Amino acid sequence: MLMFQKPKGTRDFLPEEMKKRKNIEKKLRKVFDSYNFSEINTPTFESFELLSKKTGEEIRKQLFVFKDHGDREMGLRPELTSSVARFYINEFKNTPKPVKLYYFTNCFRYENPQAGRYREFWQMGSELIGSKKPIADAEVINLAIEGLKEINMDFEINIGHLGVLKGVFEKYDLSDDEGNEIRRLIDKEDMDGLKTALSRIESEKNIEISEKVFEVLELKGGREVISKLKEKLSEFESSVTALENLDSILEFVPHEYIINFGIARGLDYYTGMVFEIYGKREGARQVCGGGRYDNLIELFEGEPSPAVGFAYGFDRIMLNIDDFEVEEESIFVVPVKSSDMLLNECLKIAKTLRDAGKAVELDLMGRKLNKALNYANTKGIKKVLIVGENDILEGKVALKNMETGEQSLIELKDILTI
């Protein structure tokens, strides 16, 4: 057994996997840029006080927490929204609104590793701060959808609104703790636990709330669900207001979706519209989640600022994609024999190709031609330029197609056409 192994819950990425990841990252960045979101990054670690500000001390067991040499308690970021909120307060509070930011970076959670769940993982997401208009929510939803369409992923999006159930809780005078307990059970899809909790609350408060909660949770479908639920909740003013807000948002979402009020989101800072996107592979893993969080900036002592955002679970996305486009092929340049003259010619050829944006590898081992060609095969390189003394004096090189075995002479002046 090797002495050193990678830490539990982390991964090494081989070159082929990194090519795939970079290709998908590039396509997603293209969509974020097309919406004129600006890329930022934040420190890998933040103060534990910041990371626990909303959820409290109980989040400690989910984080990598340590003390620095100044005895200050720090934690590796488990996600980016809190960091972006802090960054916004520090750097962007006087910037014209809305502020539109995106990021792609690694995050850390101390949890049991399993398929699609790691202790180090990557997120790509956006935050739109400063607008409470429905069109802002719609822009974020559309961005999330169009990113996944750009990479040809098969997915399903569920959209809901926390205000619908919150209005029911308010009508029955539930405390914040009781409402949060129900939300967490819904988020975990623990229906038995939910029934038990609702039964206990009904007994303690002498109310009948279970039927109304399950009525909300069970009604799913297209936009017509909103009008149906408005009829059922006509006595719940706050719930009706939330439904009308969701309807205004969906007016600007020209994509297929499922309305689902069973989306509770695990993070406590969401306040309105929420959505989740699932890959359609077996297991239907969530690959994206987001929503509106209008109180988070204020929680971190900034000026009240409405905000909406989402994050892709980049590793989950990679598990949902098979069909990767091949990036431009690399070219292998090899001299027929090792001589300073031929090596210098190879360097000139490589520079010309690299300056044109092509990926070029030189033979750095002084191999004989047959071994150099075997190396190219092993690396999956399809094009090899063979530089010989007589050919180069005539301004030519040999181009070998490693797939077909065909070889032909080409003029150096035409080198960029290969």
Swiss-Prot record:
GO molecular function, one term: ATP binding
Source organism superkingdom: Archaea
PROSITE patterns: AA_TRNA_LIGASE_II (PS50862)
Catalysed reaction, written as an equation: tRNA(His) + L-histidine + ATP = L-histidyl-tRNA(His) + AMP + diphosphate + H(+)
Alphabetical list of Pfam families matching this protein: HGTP_anticodon (PF03129), tRNA-synt_His (PF13393)
Record-level GO cellular component terms: cytoplasm
Cellular localisation: Cytoplasm
Keyword annotations of the record: Aminoacyl-tRNA synthetase, ATP-binding, Cytoplasm, Ligase, Nucleotide-binding, Protein biosynthesis
E.C. number: 6.1.1.21
Keyword rRNA-binding annotated: no
Biological processes per GO annotation: histidyl-tRNA aminoacylation; L-histidine biosynthetic process
Membrane-spanning parts: none
Principal cellular location given in the protein's record: cytoplasm
UniProt KW Cytoplasm keyword: yes
HAMAP family membership: His_tRNA_synth, HisZ
Similarity comment: Belongs to the class-II aminoacyl-tRNA synthetase family.
Protein name: Histidine--tRNA ligase
Gene responsible for this protein: hisS
